[in-house]
């Protein structure tokens, strides 16, 4: 399992418990984190294999994962379970994510210095073997997937427009609730004037 999905030993232990549950429901685990604090929070990001996830899907995952964790009890204290989608400016945690989001801007951090730096920002150019390709100012470079400590999409107008268009085309958007979506998809910067 990639350390980008589950970083700490506890995260990895819990991921090993819940991944089969999530996959049996027809979803994929994108990221899992136990956030410490006064009251710990277990954050799970999941999606359908083809991408996307709805509130009902999150509730279904939450119910099944809760049942498993109640039996296994990997977190000693009381905690809050949060199940969500990866969001538009999603983390990139699996090698396939870097192929899915080719052309979109991303921020990548490495565990060690690579050519004097740890942070890279640029357009994703896919993968080649076990390397993630990213176009930076100096040109396209390859970073071994195992070198990555963090990676996520950068929220840009193009990303928002394309994700909304994809959701609309897939019938996942109720246009009656979001009248500014067509304007955004069409490339206009201003939402329609309120005529009420």
UniProtKB/Swiss-Prot annotation:
Q: Which named protein is this?
A: Ribosome maturation factor RimP
**NCBIfam families found in the cross-reference section:** PRK00092.2-5
**Record-stated family:** Belongs to the RimP family.
Q: State the organism named in the record.
A: Dinoroseobacter shibae (strain DSM 16493 / NCIMB 14021 / DFL 12)
> What's the domain of life for this entry?
Bacteria
Q: Where in the cell is it found?
A: Cytoplasm
> Which terms in the GO cellular component ontology are assigned?
cytosol
Tell me which UniProt keywords the record has, alphabetically: Cytoplasm, Ribosome biogenesis
One Pfam short name: RimP_N
> What does it do?
Required for maturation of 30S ribosomal subunits.
Which GO BP terms sit in this record? ribosomal small subunit assembly; translation
Is-annotated flag, keyword Cytoplasm?
Answer: yes
